């Protein structure tokens, strides 16, 4: 997995460049999010636009990132969920925990509204 970092309007964007977020690479995402929030990041967007499959390990990595955000008084949002990934969020009801946006642009705009 390749994780691209960009920044736009004060929002750190992590673009996950992989078709799967699973047990093979979820620790990488978990560690990256932990490092960002420990370093003082307050606004983080994870763009899942290329991810076609997510398992419980991938969901766990994102939940861990969410907890790190809350602990650091920050905010973690998600964007670009493909249908199978969105279905997993709905099945686990994590769509009620995370702020999920269709596009990165909408997610970035949501940070300005708060």
Task: Give the ranges of each region predicted by the language model.
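General small-molecule cofactor/ligand-binding pocket signal
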Residues: 4-6, 79, 101
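A charged, well-structured terminal subsegment
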Residues: 100-114
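Structural signal for short hydrophobic segments within the conserved structured cores
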Residues: 12-14, 19, 99
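Short beta-strand/loop segment at the start of cytosolic alpha/beta domains
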Residues: 1-15
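Residues that form or immediately flank small-molecule/cofactor binding pockets and catalytic motifs
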Residues: 8-10, 83, 105
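Conserved catalytic submotifs in the C-terminal HATPase_c
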Residues: 17, 49, 105
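Amphipathic alpha-helical interaction surfaces in cytosolic regulatory modules
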Residues: 20-98
